[in-house]
Amino acid sequence: MLLWAGYASEKQVSIMTGNEMIAHLDKNKYEIVPITLNEKMDLIEKAKDIDFALLALHGKYGEDGTVQGTLESLGIPYSGSNMLSSSICMDKNISKKILRYEGVETPDWIELTKMEDLNLDELDKLGFPLVVKPNSGGSSVGVKIVYNKNELISMLETVFEWDSEVVIEKYIKGDEITCSILDGKQLPIVSIRHAAEFFDYNAKYDDTSTVEEVIELPAQIKERVNKASLTCYKALKCSVYARVDMMVKDGIPYVMEINTLPGMTQSSLLPKSAEAAGISYSKLLDMIIETSLKVRNEEGF
């Protein structure tokens, strides 16, 4: 059994997830070998003789298919979605294009690979405020709302330090929800209300700044939300578990992003959703491991 803390911008979240997993794994079932990755080569050197990799990784390199592909080459089964799905979901620009093709609502956006490509006419079509975010990344690291062109340019310079590609997205002001999926089945929907204007990194991991609770949406909206979340899961080839983050405005769910390795800390959303379905944290880990082994076996491991 292998647990991982990573080396990307979300290393601290990975460590928190790993610690939570260690605390709740059944020691009678699993031999737990915690391994910390400080650089890419650590994976090949430290993963020898491991029967299964339970990934406590988030963000670039951990959630983008890099680790998954390496483990596949080494013949080591692992938790969560495969390399293809992980890489697609981590790339916001590509995943949004696929969702648009599938008829799923997602905020209008433009992608930049360098500052010189910034088109003011395209910005005017989107209209301020806008959300600026790294094309690859999670936990809302490097994400900010901007209200004018000066703020935009300043933020772009900052985000380009995080990533070589940047997404500029139309800001949708609505009710924030998240939909967790476990083995293709939907768990209870969780709403997110927070003091901060945007559910950024600090808000996600600060229990005092947010109110997260299981909700029952009106029937018609719930049907739309469920359809959108499952369409995302299937279209992006997710497996085992995932979390789909949405904003609901005027009864329409807009998909913000899909997480193939959602947070598993004490304050994370998927464990809260699972608990509302009667699934304890320990049972959730068992289900993730068992389902992952089944999926990897079907993939040829």
From Swiss-Prot:
It catalyses: 2 D-alanine + ATP = D-alanyl-D-alanine + ADP + phosphate + H(+). Its EC number is 6.3.2.4. Its cofactor is Mg(2+); Mn(2+). GO terms for biological process: cell wall organization; peptidoglycan biosynthetic process; regulation of cell shape. Mg(2+) 2 binds at E257, N259. Its main location: cytoplasm. Keywords: ATP-binding, Cell shape, Cell wall biogenesis/degradation, Cytoplasm, Ligase, Magnesium, Manganese, Metal-binding, Nucleotide-binding, Peptidoglycan synthesis. PANTHER family: D-ALANINE--D-ALANINE LIGASE (PTHR23132), D-ALANINE--D-ALANINE LIGASE B (PTHR23132:SF23). ATP binds at residues 123-178. Pathway: Cell wall biogenesis; peptidoglycan biosynthesis. One of its GO terms (cellular component) is cytoplasm. Gene3D superfamilies: 3.40.50.20, ATP-grasp fold, A domain (3.30.1490.20), ATP-grasp fold, B domain (3.30.470.20). HAMAP family: Dala_Dala_lig (MF_00047). InterPro entries: ATP-grasp (IPR011761), ATP_grasp_subdomain_1 (IPR013815), D-Ala_lig_Van_CS (IPR000291), D_ala_D_ala (IPR005905), Dala_Dala_lig_C (IPR011095), Dala_Dala_lig_N (IPR011127), PreATP-grasp_dom_sf (IPR016185). Belongs to the D-alanine--D-alanine ligase family. The keyword Ligase applies. Cell wall formation. GO terms for molecular function: ATP binding; D-alanine-D-alanine ligase activity; metal ion binding. This is D-alanine--D-alanine ligase A. Binds 2 magnesium or manganese ions per subunit. Residues 96-290 form the ATP-grasp domain. The gene is ddlA. SMART domains: GARS_A. It is an enzyme of class 6 (ligase). The keyword Nucleotide-binding applies. Mg(2+) 1 binds at D245, E257.
